[in-house]
């Protein structure tokens, strides 16, 4: 795809988790810590088994959350309850269901705390954000949980670079719903054809921008597999590629 810029923009919208902030890295560390801290070897043959049960179910829940099929509270709880109930050693665990539910609640709470503590910027994120902020009003558009997102923003040291922050819970709708993008447009006083959205998730960031009639830059993080059914206005392998476009 030709990444030559063909029009000018008045504002830039950008996703946060795994576009600017390294949520995947923070989550990996958090899951490792929790496996040891809460003796999850009682439920699983290995840490790898725990992660193998957690990851696909978590992705499934986030997909349902994006479609308003489950609540935030259900997502937070069930992404840990499900693995606990399906661990290969569950039959040997001598405890009541209420104990497993309580553990899932504890894991859910600690996961949010740990991923926030382990927050870091992705490679090239600070350079990109400061570069873009000199040229455009920047707006974060995120589905992340409000109780931790602002703390991550503060830890980033980039607060002064953003004109607006649009969070799913504060707006009452989420990506890929066009309404969250329309709220960002309203706050910036621009129309859909005057902005571009940057994000790593095709299902929420790119499809959402398409739904709102907004151009997109899809950050694919050097994924080698082809996805011919998924298109974007521009596609880049990393954050440095965005500066070549904008």
Language model region names:
Residues 39-43, 87-91, 157-161, 189-190:
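Short helix-capping segments at alpha-helix termini
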Residues 21-25, 116, 120, 193:
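Residues in soluble alpha-helical coiled-coils and helical-bundle/repeat scaffolds
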Residues 56-110:
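A metal-dependent, Asp-based hydrolase signature
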Residues 1-12, 130, 139-141, 145-246:
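Asp-based, Mg2+/Mn2+-dependent phosphohydrolase catalytic module
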Residues 27-35, 54-58, 80, 108-115, ...:
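Hydrophobic alpha-helical core bundles mediating ligand binding, dimerization, or RNAP-core interactions
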Residues 2-53:
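Active-site neighborhood of HAD-like aspartate-dependent phosphohydrolases
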Residues 74, 100-101, 105, 109-140:
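Short, acidic loop-to-helix structural element flanking the phosphoryl-transfer center
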């Amino acid at each position: 795809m030709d990444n030559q810029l063909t029009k000018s923009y008045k504002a830039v919208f950008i996703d946060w988790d795994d576009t600017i902030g390294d949520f995947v890295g923070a989550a990996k560390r958090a899951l490792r810590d929790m496996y040891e801290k809460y003796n999850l070897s009682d439920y699983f043959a290995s840490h790898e088994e725990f992660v193998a049960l957690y990851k696909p179910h978590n992705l499934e829940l986030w997909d349902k959350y994006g479609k308003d099929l489950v609540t935030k509270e259900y997502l937070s709880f069930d992404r840990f309850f499900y693995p606990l109930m399906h661990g290969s050693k569950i039959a040997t665990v001598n405890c009541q269901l209420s104990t497993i539910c309580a553990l899932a609640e504890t894991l859910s709470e600690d996961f949010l705390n740990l991923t926030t503590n382990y927050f870091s910027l992705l490679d090239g994120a600070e350079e990109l954000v400061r570069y873009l902020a000199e040229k455009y009003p920047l707006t974060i558009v995120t589905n992340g949980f409000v109780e931790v997102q602002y703390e991550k923003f503060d830890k980033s040291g980039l607060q002064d670079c953003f004109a607006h922050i649009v969070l799913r819970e504060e707006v009452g709708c989420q990506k890929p719903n066009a309404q969250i993008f329309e709220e960002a447009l309203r706050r910036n006083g621009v129309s859909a054809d005057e902005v571009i959205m940057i994000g790593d998730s095709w299902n929420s960031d790119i499809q959402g921008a398409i739904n709102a009639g907004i151009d997109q830059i899809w950050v694919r993080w050097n994924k080698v597999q082809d996805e011919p059914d998924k298109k974007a206005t521009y596609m880049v392998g990393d954050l440095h590629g965005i500066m070549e476009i904008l």
